Swiss-Prot record:
Region of interest (Localization to microtubule plus ends), residue spans: 215-586
Pfam families listed in its UniProt record: NUDE_C
Biased composition (Low complexity): 9-19, 234-259, 309-320, 436-459
Biased composition (Polar residues): 221-233, 298-308, 370-379, 420-435, 489-502, 526-543
Gene: nudE
Signal peptide: none
One GO CC annotation: kinetochore
Stated name of the protein: Nuclear distribution protein nudE
Tree of life domain: Eukaryota
The protein's assembly and partners: Self-associates. Interacts with nudF.
Family to which this protein belongs: Belongs to the nudE family.
GO BP terms: centrosome localization; chromosome segregation; establishment of chromosome localization; establishment of mitotic spindle orientation; microtubule nucleation; nuclear migration; vesicle transport along microtubule
Function: Required for nuclear migration within hyphae during vegetative growth.
Region: Disordered, residue numbers: 1-21, 191-274, 297-341, 355-504, 526-586
């Protein structure tokens, strides 16, 4: 289609003709019609295409709407799921939170309990430390108390030993007094018999009259005879009362009085008489065939139980009788010698020889197991209990070693001598070689039982220094160390074991007894001894205390056995010895 500016240009340019204008308009009109037809055809195509596009877009819109609806549904579904999960998570979180809070509370309570437990544990530990320290203090105090008990027990035992030694010394002095009384009576009897044989002498002193011995000045005041020169001898009743009532009942006589009697016998010079084992007490007299002029001294016998402890005693130095030998020398030699004197001397020699062989056989017998084991165990426990106690025991043993034990075993002494046996009181101790006192069945059986101890064997050391020697109470004998320092009395005989007295001869006897004892000694020597041998004898402990252990808790002393060594008990039933083992009965 032509634009609007063209007619103006043509008007101005071609105003010449109208035809031209018309042709022009026609041509323009045709062009416009063709353009309109083209425009309509193109618009119809465009409209069809637009409709297709609209349909496609609508279809697409419907699809998108459906998709949106689906997505909205899914969104709603996810929203519900989210809300559900959120609620579940919140509930779980709340539960967990509650559990956390409960666990925190429990943890706090446990921490508080732990703190309280630690505080209580500290208190318990403090109490345990205090208890341990107090226990240690108590253990130390207990050990000190045990040591003090050991020392006090040792002092008590020492006091008992001293008291026992004083009692033994008192008994020995009593026995010596009785022996002096008996000796006085025997000498007076001899003088009266001599005066009967001879013509009665006047009461005045003459040069031929012997001097009065000093022994009559030493006789006790109870005796009715004070001088052997009486013209009229005392009656039998007065002599019996003087010898029987002057001696009170006392513990058994110790064996140490035999040494005093030996010295008196050797110094006085009158013949010795020793009663035979087979003789009875009533048939013993100074002269064998002559009737007895006075009754024998008798008193109740009591002996103490022995528990294996040694009882040393201080030796007493009693002045001897120096004028006895002078009296013997100044006596007239006109006393006739009868056959009964020789017979008595022969019996005395026979008894001396028999006792020597019996004591030599006793020294070889085996030790008793019960006493040895008890003494050794208690002595060993005492050594381990306290070194201070052992030192004190050594110091006391050293202090009393010079005095020694004058009543220990005297088998190795060899200085026993016979004496005149007019006392019917038996001795319940170990008979020494020279002891002439009558022995009963009990005394001989007890001497056999106690002489089997290995400490009876001869030794070079004094008896008090041997730690394993336990001399029982009532078995007292002499000690060579103290016996040599003690002066002899007029009844002792230092040479009674070796040589005959006044020319008397020994009478042979049966040799079977010595053979039996030698056979028993050979058999018993093979038995092992149960006594321990301590290296240091000074550490011997006479006390029987329980050993205190090193821990301090197990050292409680056990109950001690009943000690009856210091009590005077009633005499036991006398056991009968076996006649086949001894060769003869007592």
């Amino acid at each position: 289609m032509p634009s609007a500016d063209e007619p103006s240009s043509t008007r101005t340019n071609g105003t010449s003709s109208r035809s031209d204008q018309l042709a022009y308009y026609k041509k323009q009109y045709e062009q416009l019609e063709s353009e309109l037809a083209d425009f309509q055809a193109s618009s119809r195509e465009l409209e069809a295409e637009l409709e297709k596009e609209i349909e496609a877009s609508e279809k697409r819109e419907r699809q998108l709407k459906e998709k949106v609806d689906n997505l909205r549904y899914e969104v709603e579904e996810w929203k519900s799921k989210y809300k559900q999960s959120k609620s579940e998570a919140s509930t779980a979180q709340n539960a967990l939170q509650k559990e956390i809070t409960s666990l925190r509370d429990a943890n706090l309570t446990l921490q508080l309990k732990l703190r309280d437990t630690e505080v209580a544990n500290d208190d318990y530990e403090r109490q345990a430390r205090h208890t341990t320290s107090s226990l240690e203090d108590m253990e130390s105090k207990y050990n000190q108390a045990l040591e003090r008990e050991v020392l006090l027990d040792m002092e008590y035992k020492q006091g008992e030993q001293e008291r026992e030694s004083l009692r033994i010394e008192n008994q020995r002095l009593r026995d010596e007094l009785n022996d002096l009384k008996i000796e006085t009576e025997i000498v007076q009897e001899r003088l009266r018999n001599n005066n009967r044989r001879r013509r009665p002498a006047p009461l005045g002193r003459s040069p031929s009259t012997p001097h009065t011995p000093e022994i009559f000045d030493r006789s006790p005041g109870e005796s009715t005879v004070s001088s052997p020169l009486f013209s009229t001898p005392p009656t039998k009743l007065s002599l019996t009362l003087a010898s029987a009532t002057a001696t009170p009942p006392s513990p058994p006589m110790s064996e140490t009085s035999s040494s005093m009697r030996k010295s008196l016998t050797a110094a006085s010079g009158f013949p010795l008489q020793k009663a035979s084992a087979s003789e009875s007490f009533g048939t013993r007299s100074l002269y064998g065939n002559r009737p007895q002029r006075f009754q024998a001294h008798s008193r109740a016998t009591s002996y103490a139980f022995s528990n294996g402890r040694s009882t040393p005693s201080a030796t007493t130095t009693r002045p001897s009788l120096p004028k006895a030998n002078n009296t013997t020398a100044n006596r007239p030699s006109g006393i006739p010698k009868s056959g009964s004197l020789h017979q008595i001397r022969g019996l005395i020699g026979k008894m001396q020889k028999l006792e020597e062989r019996v004591q030599s056989a006793k020294s070889k017998l085996p030790p008793p197991s019960e006493t040895a084991s008890r003494a050794s165990s208690r002595a060993g426990s005492m050594l381990d209990a306290s070194p201070g106690a052992a030192t004190i025991a050594m110091r006391r043993d050293t202090r009393k070693r010079l005095s020694g034990s004058s009543f220990s075993s005297s088998v190795r002494d060899g200085d026993g001598a016979p004496s005149y046996v007019t006392s019917s009181r038996p001795s319940y101790g170990t008979r020494t070689q020279g002891d002439s006192r009558p022995s009963s069945r009990t005394s001989f059986s007890s001497s056999l039982s106690h002489s089997t101890h290995p400490s009876v064997t001869p030794s070079n050391r004094p008896e008090s220094r041997q730690s394993r020697t336990k001399t029982p109470l009532g078995h007292y004998s002499t000690n060579p160390t103290t016996e040599s320092r003690r002066p002899r009395s007029s009844l002792s005989n230092p040479a009674g074991q070796s040589t005959p007295i006044n020319g008397m001869t020994y009478i042979d006897e049966d040799e079977d007894l010595a053979e039996q004892f030698n056979m028993r000694a050979t058999i018993s020597s093979t038995r092992p001894t149960r006594l321990p041998s301590f290296s240091n004898p000074a550490f011997s402990t006479p006390t029987g205390l329980k050993k205190r252990s090193t821990s301090g808790m197990s050292g409680i002393p056990a109950p001690r056995t009943l000690r009856r060594g210091n009590t005077m008990g009633p005499p036991k039933t006398k056991p009968k010895p076996v006649a086949g083992d001894l060769g003869e009965t007592f």
